A protein has these predicted regions:
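N-terminal glycine-rich anion-binding loops that anchor highly charged ligand groups
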Residues: 40-54
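Short flexible coil/turn linkers enriched for glycine and charged/polar residues
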Residues: 25-27, 86-89, 107, 157-159
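Conserved beta-strand/loop subsegment of P-loop NTPase cores
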Residues: 91-94
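N-terminal basic/disordered segments at the start of proteins
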Residues: 13-44
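Beta-strand scaffold of nucleotide-dependent catalytic cores
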Residues: 30-33, 45-49, 164-165, 173-175
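Ser/Thr-glycine-rich phosphate-binding loops at phosphate-binding pockets of nucleotides
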Residues: 26-28, 97, 137, 157-163, ...
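Helical "lid/coupling" subdomains associated with nucleotide-phosphate turnover
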Residues: 6, 16-19, 36, 58-89, ...
Length: 331
């Protein structure tokens, strides 16, 4: 999935820096090349793309990054390196999250990225990940009078979910090891394949695991003080696309859409009890999310039920945008 509109690199506007941000998670790797003005908070997107690489394949079970997962990731990095060169980004920052934090052979991953992109991936903590996500998601929301404070930003990734509460800045943050890939591999896989569809026993075990993770998050983050829930990442945006019955994935219609808790519950129940073929037939469904979207939707629903949120505000701006702002600020 990519978004790029230029046959050649446009000039950098005065007061802006051209930066590239790469976010490598458990399920996907993403690139943003943008012109950023840290003084005004403006971000002019030049290229934004995502590739499903499933870097975290079997990490929860083996503790290692699989050779085929590394090669998929390096192939995407080679594609991104070409785009970064073509657009002339002055600064590049590569942030790696849950899967590479957990892997015993992450040095192999680091060496490969350095060889291809010339920058060393920062294997950041869950708390750092949460701060970047909050910055990216709330930059545009802070001037909105229709959204009450504080925000609770939830970034539902492949291996972990970040919770951040704050108004203008982060007040409290926590990362927990619950994500769409990790929950799928831990609870919905039997004999090397995702159960099609999952059993009620599997679903109940996954729900209990998610609830325990929410208990952990609440030890640090006052979840129930939130007045606006903001949801990030592919599980949330895919649920939005299903709720809107989009004929294809449409970032503009998804960004800042609002989904009611009842609608999220309806979609989650359908995803949990549907077959692979039924999920794959959804027009807006990325092929790489077909097997893991049910777990991601259940994480979102569980959060909404825990805090009593009537709706979730969906944001396409997330950790990538937060990284880009930090790069431009020289942080």
């Amino acid at each position: 999935m990519r978004s790029s509109f230029f046959a050649y690199a446009p000039l950098v506007p005065e007061g802006f820096s051209r930066v590239a941000a790469v976010d490598c998670g458990t399920n996907s790797i993403r690139l943003l090349v943008a012109d950023v003005n840290p003084a005004t908070g403006e971000l002019l997107e030049l290229d934004r793309r995502m590739t499903i690489v499933r870097l975290g394949q079997d990490v929860d079970r083996t503790g290692r990054l699989a050779p085929e997962a590394l090669e998929r990731t390096f192939a995407a990095c080679r594609d991104y390196a070409e785009t970064i060169r073509e657009l002339g980004a002055e600064k590049v920052r590569f942030v790696a999250t849950s899967a590479s934090r957990d892997a015993s052979n992450r040095d192999e991953f680091v060496r490969g990225v350095v060889d291809i992109l010339g920058v060393e991936p920062e294997v950041i903590s869950g708390d750092q990940e949460a701060e970047f996500s909050f910055t990216g998601a709330t930059k545009e929301l802070k001037g909105r009078d229709d959204l009450a404070r504080p925000f609770l930003v939830v970034d539902i990734g492949g291996g972990s979910t970040e919770f951040v509460v704050g108004e203008e800045h982060v007040r409290a943050a926590r990362s927990v090891d619950v994500g769409c890939v990790r929950m799928t591999e831990r609870h919905l896989v039997r004999d090397g394949a995702v159960t099609d569809p999952p059993t009620e026993e599997q679903i109940a075990a996954m729900r209990a695991d998610i609830e325990r993770a929410l208990d952990l998050a609440e030890e640090t983050v006052p979840l129930c003080e939130a007045r606006t829930l903001v949801g990030l990442a592919g599980s949330v945006t895919t649920v939005s696309s299903i709720a809107q019955e989009l004929p294809e994935y449409d970032s503009e219609r998804i960004h800042h859409s609002r989904i009611s808790r009842d609608k999220v519950r309806e979609i989650t129940e359908w995803l949990l009890h549907s077959t692979h073929a039924e999920r794959a037939a959804v027009p807006s469904m990325h092929p790489g999310r077909v097997d893991v979207i049910a777990a991601g939707a259940l994480v979102l629903l569980s959060i909404m039920e825990r805090i009593g949120a009537e709706e979730v505000v969906v944001s396409e701006h997330d950790i990538l945008d937060g990284i880009a702002f930090k790069v431009a600020e020289g942080v």
